[in-house]
């Protein structure tokens, strides 16, 4: 059996690795990277360190408006599907890559496997919610992480091909968290790249991320969030999302922050380490919230 797997963001590579290790024992897999998220951390070191298969195809789509990005992905994915003629197409989660892969396969009648099906926020302003609902509607096999996800699909009259298989993110976090203790704390702090000044090691910390448009597009919200970070009883390690960097830099020109360690986005294992050992995590990321639960870190 031949499966074409579509991924476009770093978390999807991590999740796909957990499944690919099993698939490739018995089946042929073609791994397609849409290029949705260009990440300097996704070098050969990223794939080697995490034992992740390197992509067989990189479409190199890059950033753009939602419509343009999704359309360009669909064109590239369709070319791959017509060439490879797979038995199934597999997609993960709720990114534009997910939707593009599902639509491209559906149009040429290739069955679709959706991993992490059935998740709902019930906020239709979120692009992720739109992507996951549309992908579920045209998928053949819907692999749900929880019984709640199964029930969500039932409410939408989707019952065929639905299975509760457990959470692949949990598999990935548990697998990679075992690798963290191979290095001392100093090793991970040496990897932190300060945006405005060098970063020194600290004994305890909070880990914070902000990336949702509801927060990043409003300078007053960012100002209030950073003010709250300043009041915490330990330093806040804050990997700054590219979307947030301009506003953060502007606010730093207005006010000196003493309790916040502004750092560049970090690699997956580094991030996992700082989440696992944080006093608490503060985030608007659904994925990170789930990781904190798995790692037993307050959030």
Region locations from a protein language model:
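Conserved nucleotide-sugar phosphate-binding/catalytic loop shared by glycosyltransferases and other
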Residues: 28-69
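A short, Lys/Arg-enriched amphipathic alpha-helix followed by its capping loop at the start of a domain
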Residues: 19-28, 228-232
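Short, glycine-rich nucleotide/cofactor-binding loops
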Residues: 3-13, 211-219
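Donor-nucleotide binding loops and adjacent catalytic segments primarily
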Residues: 44, 181-277
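Active-site and donor-binding regions of nucleotide-sugar-utilizing enzymes
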Residues: 4-7, 13-22, 46, 58-157
